[in-house]
Amino acid sequence: MPEITLRLFIFSLFLLVSQSVFAQQAIVAVAANMKDAFGEINTAFKSEGNRDVRVVYGSSGNFTAQIMNGAPFNLLISADGHFPIELYRQGKSIDEGVVYAIGQLVIISKNSAGIRLSDSKTELIKAINKANKIAIAKPDLAPYGKAAIEYLKAEGLWNIAKDKLIYADNVGIATMYVVTGAADLGFTAISLAKSAEVSKETNFMLVDSKLYEPIKQRMVLMKGAPQEALSFYRFMQSAQAKSILQKYGYSTP
């Protein structure tokens, strides 16, 4: 191969590799309870001139299993602290990450079901007895589902509720079961309960946070993540992101 042709070939190859690296888009796995809040945070992130990130919503447990099996997520924004720490223990992340928010569990009721929500145990028993189904996220996959079961047991409602439970892969799906009427009652995050889509079809009641383990939501950065993932990780800890989280009902560290 002539020298000039070889040089052109090497230069072209260098350009292709450089463009591929530059074009690498950060992929962020986000717990379903964060959907509305994260959408606003992502908009704020892009407004500062940052490149767009690819966002996938789902359950923290499913994302963790997928990352363990090689899924190319660069940043996990989890609904709890257990799954991110497990990724660190398995050598997938750069460290144990940080707690970015503390969530609140609520009960929601479909407006058309005519069920009254009250923090009176007597009224809650009436509501559960009247409900056709009660939607929760799978407790082994989603922290809000785990918290819901802890609450029901601590409040002495488990025995009357357990046979009416229907399980969803994540809290977003559990919420939609109530919105669509597949269930009359459900447990979800306050951030989802306050969203426009959900609030027009349901009403909600805050659950006593002393009756379930605090939902400390942690995020963790994977090894080899591109710069944009690191930038987003840092932005999630900014005053601007914390202000948005608080607006959606989260407490922040």
Language-model features: locations:
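Bacterial N-terminal signal peptides that target proteins for export
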Residues: 1-10
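Sec/Tat signal peptide C-region and signal peptidase I cleavage site
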Residues: 17-23
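Exported/periplasmic ABC-transporter solute-binding proteins
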Residues: 23-50, 54-56, 61, 65-71, ...
